[in-house]
């Protein structure tokens, strides 16, 4: 819903399309392939949810629970993304603390040869970007990863 509002407010209607889907459900039959897939999936390990700050605990459990190790959604998305992306597309994830290397490795196993992990302003690994080697984003990601 927020992405659609942003498309409208930035006057990108007609140039940008958005789709919302359940990443753990069966893959939807989308028309065409995506240039960009961005995901901020639930990434908190199930056992850690009870110990979260009260304000975070008020969030719907589906927005928090990433499974036993917090990586369930990343496994599914990295497996399915190559089937739904253009050859030189870009995959971007927000990640939880200490998940950067695991998510980066999943991207590599899925065939993304250019992978970069970026830190937030507090110095915590927060984003993973992935693209096919030789694609239009590959050189940029390799530069970011340095």
Please describe what each predicted stretch is.
Residues 51, 62, 69, 83, ...:
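Class I S-adenosyl-L-methionine
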Residues 1-53:
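Conserved SAM/SAH cofactor-binding pocket of Class I
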Residues 131-146:
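Flexible, glycine-/basic-rich loop-and-beta segments that form/coincide
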Residues 45-47, 100, 137:
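Short glycine-rich, flexible loops that bind phosphorylated cofactors or substrates
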Residues 68-132:
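Conserved Class I SAM-dependent methyltransferase catalytic core
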Residues 43-72:
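Mobile active-site "lid"/loop adjacent to the S-adenosyl-L-methionine
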